[in-house]
Structure formats: C-alpha cells, structure tokens
C-alpha cells in the first residue's frame, strides 16, 4: 500500500515559475517561500473554496489578478465587493483597455452595457450565421430573466419568456438603433394591452406581421390566449422586468453601450473587464450573469473565427461568489470544457464548493465542472462533507503502532476545519499537495504606486424608447394608403364605357356599420373584463414574515399589487394579513417571494 506525503518545498521551487513582475505568463500564486512567489501558469482551471473571511479574495484571487495584469494577459472578473477593481485597476490602466460596469452605482458607472445591442447587430447582419447567434442570445436573456423554478408550474415562466422573446424580435424588426434597449421592452409591455377597436394593441401589431416573422411566431400564443391567461402571463413578464425598470439609473445604464462586446479583441491590446455587483442583495446577479455569458461566448466565437481556435492573449476569468450569479451562466459546464483549448482560464470562488455547484447546476453538470478543475485552494469551510472530501483527496499515510502498520488520513476533516485565516490546502492536478499560509496580496506584490481607479462616465447621450402605439398607427395608415392606391389604380385602368354609373358603395352606410361593429366589440370586451375580474381574483394570507427583510417585502408587495408602501407596512404589522391579487400568477409570485425571504404564506381558497 502506498503511503501518501505532502509535496516538498524543493519540488515546488523546481517545477513552478517565479512571479517577480517581469514574468510574461501568469497564474495563481501557489506558494510564497523565502521572499519568492511561485505561480502555476498551466491551462488548468482553478477553484477557491472556503467560508467567508478566510482570505479567498485578499490572498488568492487578488494576487492572481495582479499577476495576470503585470504579465499583460487579459482579465475578466465578477467583483461583488468592488475589491478587485479598487486594488488592481491602477495596474490595468497602464497597458490594458479597462472596462468597468458598476451595478452598485449605475449612474456613476464608468461604462454602460446594452444587453440587447449585440444580439441586434447580429440579427441585422447580412451573414446568416449571425442570425443563429442572435437567436441564441435572445433566448439566453429570456430564460435568464424567467428561469424555470423547481417544484413550481413551469408554464408561466416559459410563457413569459416566449412573450419577452417575441417583443424583442418585434423591437428588432420595427425599432431604430437608438430604440434597442430594455426600456423599450418595458414600454412595449406597458402598451401591449391598450384597448383599441374592440381588440388590444399588441394583437393589432401582430396582425400586420408576415407569417414567417420571428416576432409573430413567439407572440401569437400570447395574443390568442384567453383574457385571464394572457393577464397572468403579462403579470409574470412585467414583474421580472420591474426590478430593473424601477431604477432609472440602471435602465439608463442598460440603454447605452460603451463596451461593444461584438468588437472586443485581445490581439493588439489586452482587456481588463470588471463587473461590480452589490454584495448585500442579489437583484442584479442575473444581469451580471448575462453580461459574463455574452463575453465568454464572444471570445470563444472570436477564437474560432479569427485565430484558428486559440486566442493569442490568454483571458483569465475570475467568478467571485459564483453561487449567486451561476444560475445566469447556465452554459458554465460547457464553458469549462471548451475554454481551455481557446486559451481561456477560469477561477471559481465559492463558500462550499461541490454542494453549491450541485445546487446551482445539478449533480451531473457539477460533476462536469469539478472534472475540469486542476488547481484547488481549500480554505476552512463549514461543510463537513466538503472537508471529508478534501481529506480523502489528500490520501492516507502508513504509520507503525505497537509493531503493526496501520493507515490514517494525512490530514483529517477536523484539522482542515481548524486551519487559521489565510491558510489553505493546495491541490494541483492530483500531483502536488501541500498546506501553506498565504500573505495578503500587498505583501506579495509591491503596491507602492497604488491610486484609486478613474471613474469617469464615458457616455453622455440620452436613450429613446420604442412607441408601440405610434408604430401600430403608422402601420394602419400605410395599409389604408396601399388600399387607396390599389383602388385608384384599378379605377384608372377600367374603361369608362364599362364603368358603372352608380357608386360602388354608400360611404355613410359603411361608416355606420363600422361604428356599430366597434360598439359591439367594445361591449364584448367590457363583458369579458367584468367576468375576468370576478373569476380571476385570488387572496393570499401571510402568516409569518422575516423581520430582517420587511423593507424588501414592502417594496415587492407595493410594486406587485400597486398599494402604497405605507399601507403595506401597516398591514404587515398585524399578522396574519390578507392581500387580494388580480390573477393567480400574482398570487403565486407573492407566495413564492414570501417563502423565499423566510416567511410563510398560502392561497386562500
């Protein structure tokens, strides 16, 4: 039986490179010994695992980012606290194109990003392959905004995603460049149910579209649905968008674009891209995930189209707090497999490695991700399952006790749990294993030239939104003009000898019939609305709330049910409390939100 042992320091110093500020390759710092820093510059992906406050960011990910920037490789990172940006941007400013998207302070964000613009450019391209990319991006945005939630009816979110997708195609077909933004989608949703001529605005719009229109294919299910079903779909769709549209600063940031993802390249100048998100709530995690997904897909496509499958300058991606944003990067398992050969390396930062990956991606996909990891930094964690896994990976050693050879773990789960701050077990490709204490990043690298990053806003123009009502009016007018021109042409082509001496129709009689029909349709709509209100109303009883999240709950209920925040707060102060919802979808959304925030609610039959 083989007796395992830790890797000797001499083996590390012999087989790994030194990070001295002049190195032309980069990687995570794996050992600091006798004033010398050693790093791993292989293609292997990296995972950093450990509970909060153990030094994952200060000792590992920040040092990795600095080493990457000094070696003039490219860097992309999701930065929940803004630490990476604050600590490393001054280095990036020297040789890199620096892009910073700040979801914490959207009005002050140095850069702006329009999640629809890249797809729009592909959609309007003459290259048929680009149309496929556009469709894929639109679908990914839709399913990130409306994900399928386990143990709930998938119909509503899938229908809402289809509705959003149809509106996006409609915007691409009918809007101009400056109108392509999320604010336009929100305005289109608001206007879609406007009553007109006994119908509603979106149904009229769809009626003008050709049968092979992508917009019509996705919207016809919505426009032909019964009133109560349509109202519920609309409620679910608008509710997910409201978390963005309620912030004017955020909507402004998402309506401009200084990033221009489709034209990013790393050949002439490396890039340093920082995506800053709040660490005290997860409202913008979805957007950060979409942004990261668009970036990675672009660079993989760029490697394929321009560089024979491998980028000339390595891109290093740091995903801090992956458990939060991971759901919006649904393609991560495939990315882990595809990235390595494209010269893209990822570092995943988690608090409970395997269990968080399984929670976000499922067991099979989590196994794919773990199989792609070559370098592991294991700090102390609260998960005994994870600690036992690391203990088993290190292996057993043989010892002699009273003349007998027995085996015991080289390190136990308890010993791993007891590791102090900044101390980690390092595992590299199942070949090297050792425990080391890391200094803070500013002890590893000289930070004497540090200064705060430049935060100048690069965009000054205002965005405009698409007006669905005006578009429908123009399409109606165009249809009338074409009909009149056709009638006029037909009349001119007819020989006067054979023309009838009486009018083809009585204009006043026709107008009277049209008015009567409109009145009938409006009466039908009124009856349908009355029936919908009487049969569709639901009541939700809230019996318990999480007092630490009352403010969040007040905002949500106020927006969902259009009740003043003051009245909501008064109601919540005397539990149990009943709220009346206009649709089953609203009721289900409210119940799910209350439970998700630690409360209890149920539908009142």
Go through the PLM ranges and name each one.
Residues 2-6, 10, 19-23, 29, ...:
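P-loop NTPase motor domains
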Residues 498-605:
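Short, amphipathic alpha-helical interaction segments embedded in low-complexity terminal/linker regions
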Residues 336-429:
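Conserved ATP-driven motor cores of ASCE-family P-loop NTPases powering translocation/secretion/packaging/pilus
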């Amino acid at each position: 039986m083989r007796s395992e042992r830790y890797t000797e320091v001499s083996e590390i110093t012999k087989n790994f490179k030194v990070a001295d500020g002049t190195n032309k390759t980069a990687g995570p710092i794996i050992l600091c010994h006798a004033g010398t820093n050693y790093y791993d510059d292989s293609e292997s992906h990296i995972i950093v695992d450990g509970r909060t406050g153990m030094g994952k960011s200060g000792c590992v990910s920040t040092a990795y980012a600095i080493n990457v920037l000094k070696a003039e490789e490219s860097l992309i990172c999701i930065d929940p606290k803004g630490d990476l940006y604050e600590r490393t941007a001054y280095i990036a400013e020297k040789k890199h194109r620096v892009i910073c998207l700040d979801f914490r302070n959207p009005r002050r964000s140095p850069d702006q990003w329009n999640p629809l613009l890249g797809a729009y450019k592909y959609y309007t391209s003459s290259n048929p392959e680009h149309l496929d990319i556009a469709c894929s991006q639109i679908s990914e945005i839709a399913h990130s905004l409306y994900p399928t939630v386990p143990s709930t009816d998938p119909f509503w979110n899938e229908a809402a995603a289809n509705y959003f997708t149809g509106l996006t195609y409609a915007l691409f077909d009918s809007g101009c460049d400056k109108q392509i933004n999320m604010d336009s989608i929100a305005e289109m949703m608001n206007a879609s149910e406007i009553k007109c001529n006994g119908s509603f605005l979106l149904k009229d719009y769809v009626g003008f579209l050709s049968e092979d229109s992508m917009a019509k294919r996705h919207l016809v299910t919505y426009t032909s649905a019964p009133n109560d079903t349509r109202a519920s779909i609309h409620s679910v769709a608008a509710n997910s968008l409201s978390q963005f549209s309620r912030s004017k600063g955020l909507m402004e940031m998402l309506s401009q674009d200084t990033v221009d993802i489709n034209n990013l390249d790393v050949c002439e100048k490396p890039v340093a891209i920082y995506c800053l998100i709040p660490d005290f709530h997860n409202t913008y995690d979805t957007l950060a995930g979409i942004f990261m997904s668009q970036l990675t897909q672009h660079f993989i496509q760029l490697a394929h189209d321009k560089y024979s499958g491998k980028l000339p300058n390595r891109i290093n991606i740091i995903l801090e707090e992956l458990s939060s944003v991971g759901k919006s990067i649904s393609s991560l398992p495939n990315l882990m497999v595809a990235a390595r050969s494209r010269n893209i390396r990822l570092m995943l930062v988690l608090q409970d490695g395997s269990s968080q990956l399984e929670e976000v991606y499922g067991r099979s996909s989590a196994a794919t991700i773990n199989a792609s990891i070559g370098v592991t930094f294991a700090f102390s964690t609260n998960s005994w399952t994870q600690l036992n896994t690391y203990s088993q990976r290190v292996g057993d050693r043989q010892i002699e006790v009273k003349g007998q050879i027995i085996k015991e773990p080289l390190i136990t789960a308890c010993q791993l749990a007891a590791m102090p701050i900044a101390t980690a077990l390092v595992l590299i490709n199942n070949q090297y294993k050792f425990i080391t204490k890391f200094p803070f990043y500013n002890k590893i690298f000289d930070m004497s030239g540090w200064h705060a990053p430049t935060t100048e806003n690069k965009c000054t123009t205002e965005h405009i939104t698409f007006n669905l009502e005006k578009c429908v009016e123009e399409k109606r007018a165009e249809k009338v003009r074409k009909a009149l021109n056709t009638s006029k042409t037909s009349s001119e082509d007819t020989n006067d000898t054979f023309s009838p001496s009486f009018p083809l129709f009585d204009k006043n009689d026709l107008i009277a019939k049209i008015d009567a029909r409109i009145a009938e349709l409006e009466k039908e709509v009124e009856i349908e609305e009355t029936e919908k209100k009487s049969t569709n109303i639901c009541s939700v009883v809230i019996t318990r709330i999480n007092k630490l999240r009352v403010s969040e709950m007040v905002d949500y209920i106020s927006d969902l049910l259009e009740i003043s925040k003051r009245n909501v707060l008064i109601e919540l102060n005397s539990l149990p409390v009943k709220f009346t919802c206009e649709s089953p979808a609203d009721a289900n959304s409210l119940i799910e939100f209350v439970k998700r925030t630690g409360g209890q609610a149920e539908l009142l039959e």
